[in-house]
UniProtKB/Swiss-Prot annotation:
GO terms for biological process: inositol trisphosphate metabolic process. Residues 140-347 form the ATP-grasp domain. ATP binds at residues 130, 180, 212-223, 238. GO terms for molecular function: ATP binding; inositol-1,3,4-trisphosphate 5-kinase activity; inositol-1,3,4-trisphosphate 6-kinase activity; inositol-3,4,5,6-tetrakisphosphate 1-kinase activity; magnesium ion binding. Gene3D superfamilies: ATP-grasp fold, B domain. It is an enzyme of class 2 (transferase). Belongs to the ITPK1 family. The gene is ITPK1. Mg(2+) 1 binds at D303, D318. This is Inositol-tetrakisphosphate 1-kinase 1. Transmembrane segments: none annotated. It comes from Oryza sativa subsp. japonica (Rice). Pfam families: Ins134_P3_kin (PF05770), Ins134_P3_kin_N (PF17927).
């Protein structure tokens, strides 16, 4: 979660970075890259519509330098001008939540089907509401020899804080509960969360919100980044486990800016190897592939935790579109290969259709 958007993201502490990528398709060869560049007319034009903070965190010098070597040209889109008068573009990257802009982009997609828009605005909408955000994970009901993937039981509260205790009791949710804003709109406030230990504190919350049952997970969270058909996992510190003492001696609401920087003592903590162990690759590959297909997205990450004491039970607790890739080790090469693969796939389809 965020306090000051990108500024607070820099304060996230990594426990350990997973050293290996999990590709779902082979990387581009030198010959394939050359073919892609040729198809793109000697250069690949990527238009971007991002906030200033997103531009700073994503379009870092190393990425731009590598892009130039691969004949990829990033062009800023002017939102004050008609999109059809700009370009031409091969790919459009965007992360703006303005509804008018979303409609402009949808209209542009219809008029220019040859341009790849990352990602379709209508697909992104599912991640702007926490009531629908995790539904695809729940519907997937993923369980195999490598583990089980669940979502926390949750309850949506639209209004009237005083009604929350009775609503929680009726739904049968177990304390403690994590409260998150219902709408994710890119602001720091929409990424804040609160932890409520007792029933009497629930009426102190501010709807509309989603209440999720807190699952003890050893204070470790796995951030799983998805870029097309490649995934990478990074460990982060998270909220500490809750015990009986906490439940009996905390009667208020504890507020945190984001899950992965919620504890001040994490930096010096010793991590149990059984807690820090990454989820099995086959499980992550299956989950990443299914979410990409069901969500209709190619740029996202999801936060996953392992239930403490249950080696094979995992929970997805959040999904984010176009996350902070700048904090993902080696993101520059991964992203450039992804952009080139998009044009390569277009080239293959063009050949098969001719």
């Amino acid at each position: 979660m965020r306090v000051h958007e990108e500024a607070s993201e820099d304060k996230e502490r990594e426990v350990e970075e997973a050293p290996d990528l999990m590709p779902l398709s082979p990387p581009l060869t030198a010959a394939a890259t050359a073919a892609v560049v040729a198809v793109a007319g000697q250069r690949l034009v990527v238009g971007y519509a991002l906030t200033k903070k997103k531009v700073k965190s994503f379009l870092q010098p190393k990425l731009l330098s590598l892009a130039r070597k691969k004949s990829i040209h990033f062009v800023s889109i002017d939102e004050t001008r008609p999109l059809s008068e700009q370009g031409p573009f091969d790919i459009i990257l965007h992360k703006l939540t303005d509804k008018e802009w979303q409609q402009v982009l949808e209209d542009y997609r219809e008029e220019h089907p040859e341009v790849t828009v990352l990602d379709p605005p209508n697909a992104i909408q599912h991640l702007h509401n926490r009531q629908s955000m995790l539904q695809e994970v729940a519907d997937l009901n993923l369980s195999n020899a490598y583990g089980e993937v669940c979502t926390p039981r949750q309850l949506v509260i639209m209004k009237d804080p005083l009604s929350i205790p009775s609503a929680v009791a009726k739904a049968g949710l177990t304390l403690p509960l994590v409260a998150k804003p219902l709408v994710v709109d890119g602001t720091s406030k929409s990424h804040e969360l609160s932890l409520a230990y007792v029933e009497t504190s629930l009426s102190m919350l501010d709807p509309p919100l989603v209440l999720q049952e807190f699952v003890n997970h050893g204070g470790i969270l796995f951030k799983v980044y998805v870029v097309g058909e490649t995934i990478r996992v990074v460990r982060r510190f998270s909220l500490p486990d809750v015990n009986i003492y906490d439940l009996e001696n905390n009667d208020g609401i504890f507020r945190f800016p984001r899950v992965s920087c919620a504890t001040n003592t994490a930096e010096d903590a010793e991590v149990d190897p059984s807690i820090a162990e990454l989820p099995p690759k086959p499980l992550l590959e299956k989950l990443g592939r299914e979410l990409r297909r069901r969500l209709g997205l190619r740029l996202f990450n999801f936060d996953m935790i392992r239930e403490h004491g249950r080696k094979d039970r995992y929970y997805v607790i959040d999904i984010n579109y176009f996350p902070g890739y700048g904090k993902m080790p080696g993101y520059e090469h991964i992203f450039i290969d992804f952009l080139l693969s998009l044009v390569q796939n277009k080239y293959k389809r063009r050949l098969s259709g001719s």
